[in-house]
Amino acid sequence: MQPLSKLMAISKPRNLSLREQREVLRADMSWQQETNPVVETHDSEASRQKFRHFQYLKVSGPHEALSQLWELCLQWLRPEIHTKKQIIELLVLEQFLAILPEEVRTWVNLQHPNNSKDMVTLIEDVIEMLEDEDMPCKDSALQMGSIKEKMKAGSRTGKPQEPVTFKDVVVEFSKEEWGQLDSAVKNLYRNVMLENFRNLNSLRKAHLLSKPFESLKLESKKKRWIMEKEIPRKTIFDMKSISGEESSHGVIMTRLTESGHPSSDAWKGENWLYRNQKKWDINLPQEAFIPETIYTEEEDFECSENKKSFDINSVSSICAIQVGIPSRKGSPKCDKFKTYFKFNLDSVGKQHSEYEYGNDLSLSTDIRHQKSHTTMNSYECYQCGKAFCRSSSLIRHQIIHTGEKPYKCSECGRFFNRRTNLTKHQKLHAEAKACTSNKCGKAFSKSEDSNNPTLHFGNNFYQCVNCGKSFNRSSSLIRHQMIHTGEKPFKCKECSKAFNRSSNLVKHQKLHTRDKS
């Protein structure tokens, strides 16, 4: 019979029968060794996480998988420094944490208990703190942790008879009760409330997306149109079984009331719950949520780009969410276009309607207006991360990374990555041909470094045949050639003196004027 310490040191473990396991445990229960509290370090916790989340698919076979599991277990339990009692303490501590409610487990982990006894003391302190002064919400932390379990039990009985609203999952505190709570419990309360609220919000959207519509109505101020086509039952968010499945947070609901569903991004502000609590007939402490300056459903919403106004009467407009139109009620104003758009959009549907507010604009025009802002720079290069507002700009940009040069010069065979560069290059050839005149006296053949014609042309296209000096204008070349020919076409009428430049003649004539004065 081998003791537990020797079993830990075996490099290649073997499977023990149930009888052998019982004998080993019975033999090891006789130890009388003093032990110290187990303190889990960061490395120990990391090893435990690796051991618990080890995946078989990452190894080549069962032997390697068993070997790695054995190694990770040794790194976690550390049998070379921990006693047998400390190892069992680690296992019991882990299991104890696993059976606690999620919120309580999170709070206990933040306190970093050394052993299971310390953990029990922490939980008892929370219970005693909530029981002080006959608080009406006994064990509120545990009650908050069991909210989801209660909702699970209600969902197992079948489809709910009444729609589930935010009031059904809220835990209320008075101002006096809130002042008596510890800061850690307050943070826990705030996080649980926001989590439940987000669950309701997300499941509401999923239910709308999975619901088939026989007819959808779009209403404007004067007209009404009925949708002709049915939305396919299978959407990209195929959530047909949402009523019978458990969400990632353990909340099961089938539908929500319109009054219980906020706008798509309303929950981003934590004080939204406090300001809208009357809708659910609940009482929340004001101190529980940080005040922020955000829009309510009753406030106007303006397009930040050009102040165009949209009045969306449906807070659950899936089509609006997809294209980026803010799904909240309001009548914002458009100062730039002086055009108002009002429509009622209850879900995704074919766009059939026109609206008469000065101009006849279709629903697609309204959506395209906002989409022009929300989808700006929506085409991103996967190599450098640069974004563009048009797909053609992205394609032209990607040529830089690929090195492709699809534009070829028919004169010299040189390639360019942009059409504009080819056009500029071809202009050099055209000007070079014009430079083979008698004024320049030098012709450029294709054989003279045709791959780089700018060496010949550059910015100076006109070259003097006498001294080789180049000029970028023909008039400058003509004026320069007068130096070599000695020609002086500008003659003074006073003294008959001739000059090769008109500027020199003007200066000379000023001398005559000064002498006369």
Curated annotation (Swiss-Prot):
InterPro entries: C2H2-ZF_domain, KRAB, KRAB_dom_sf, SCAN_dom, SCAN_sf, Znf_C2H2_sf, Znf_C2H2_type. It is found in: Nucleus. The keyword Plastid does not apply. GO terms for cellular component: nucleus. The keyword Repeat applies. A zinc finger (C2H2-type) spans 379-401, 407-429, 462-484, 490-512. This is Zinc finger protein 215. One of its GO terms (molecular function) is RNA polymerase II cis-regulatory region sequence-specific DNA binding. It comes from Homo sapiens. The lineage of its organism: Eukaryota, Metazoa, Chordata, Craniata, Vertebrata. Keywords: DNA-binding, Metal-binding, Nucleus, Repeat, Transcription, Transcription regulation, Zinc, Zinc-finger.
